[in-house]
């Protein structure tokens, strides 16, 4: 499987959790609440929401922030969640033994969660550098 990323590598950092053992519908219920919010506000929301999906998403947001801090030297106070998506994963199928030699199927859905964090200060500097370049260098 080839994963293509069309993110700006200078202003965005992402983290992916695959094969999380819950349905994508239940994870989307939580992801929709945090999309577009700041990092600090997201942590508060995830700690106070009463859903089972909050814990793996909270771990993923922590991981994305650690990636941003360690790899790109971003400040956690300036991070926002620019993209958050949930996709369906494989369905784990089992058979539960029943009476008279029968077997009932058990379907356990999984999902893949992607969190993309963006640093607002770095993005402004990045866009300003292009504005300078367009204004002075590419002018004929």
Curated annotation (Swiss-Prot):
One of its GO terms (cellular component) is large ribosomal subunit. InterPro entries: Ribosomal_uL22, Ribosomal_uL22_bac/chlpt-type, Ribosomal_uL22_bac/org-type, Ribosomal_uL22_CS, Ribosomal_uL22_sf. The keyword Cytoplasm does not apply. Keywords: Chloroplast, Plastid, Ribonucleoprotein, Ribosomal protein, RNA-binding, rRNA-binding. It holds the Pfam family Ribosomal_L22. Part of the 50S ribosomal subunit. This is Large ribosomal subunit protein uL22c. It comes from Morus indica.
